[in-house]
């Protein structure tokens, strides 16, 4: 039986609920987040995406630096039924970003606070 990314996440959540899944550097130390804690955040964000109108099969982009919320955001997209259209934070030109969003038929964009100005620069186009 083929497994989805959701299946591959759910399995260790069941088997190792209190084990560390993610580490994030805050200051000089790394803060652990368990599988259960990540699952709760993923479920909450996924439900929020659905409440905002994300439907199964909608194309959605995620523009974020590599960090825990990137992992949580991508999993939440999958739980909401969205299809992830990959973007690189290295897209410097607004027309490159716009091209990918338009040609990827992206309906929703999840973006980190530090990269928000890149998305805002093309909203009116």
Residue ranges of model-derived segments:
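Aromatic/hydrophobic pocket-lining residues that form π-stacking "cages" and hydrophobic walls in ligand
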Residues: 9, 73, 119
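Conserved AMP-binding/adenylate-forming
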Residues: 31-32, 47-91
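Conserved ATP-dependent adenylate/AMP-binding module captured primarily in the ANL superfamily
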Residues: 91-123
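Short beta->alpha junction loops/turns
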Residues: 27, 38, 66-67, 89-90, ...
């Amino acid at each position: 039986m083929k497994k989805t990314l959701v299946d591959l996440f759910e399995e260790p959540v069941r088997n190792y609920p209190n084990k560390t899944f993610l580490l994030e550097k805050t200051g000089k130390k790394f803060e652990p987040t368990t599988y259960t804690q990540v699952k709760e955040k993923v479920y909450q964000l996924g439900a929020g995406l659905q409440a905002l109108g994300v439907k199964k099969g909608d194309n959605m982009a995620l523009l974020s630096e590599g960090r825990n919320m990137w992992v949580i955001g991508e999993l939440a997209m999958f739980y909401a039924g969205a299809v992830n259209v990959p973007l690189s934070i290295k897209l410097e030109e607004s027309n490159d970003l716009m091209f990918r969003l338009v040609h990827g038929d992206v309906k929703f964009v999840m973006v980190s606070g530090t990269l928000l100005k890149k998305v805002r620069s093309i909203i009116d186009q």
